[in-house]
Amino acid sequence: MTKQELEQIARITLEEKEGKLYRGYLDLRGTQITSLPDNLTVGGSLDLRGTQITSLPDNLTVGGSLYLRGTQITSLPDNLTVGGSLYLRGTQITSLPDNLTVGGSL
């Protein structure tokens, strides 16, 4: 997914810096989004509840909480970093990667 496609779906403007995307709270809840850009960094929380997304990119960094309820995600990517809480209720995720970092509750 390109930066422009993500902006169109989320109806926001993203600041691009060194190939990563930075922004505060990124609310994609209930959208038709199916993928996220590689190496995405979200400064605040990332809300993907009820989306069509099936996987997360490697090296995803979320400064706040990550909400995945109602998604089709079955596993978490390598090097996932979540500064806040990670909400997995209502997903098909059955195991966690060894290198997962979560600053809040799980």
Spans of features found by a protein language model:
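Extreme N-terminal leader/activation tails
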Residues: 1-13
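A detector of tandem-repeat and repeat-rich interaction/domain scaffolds
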Residues: 11-106
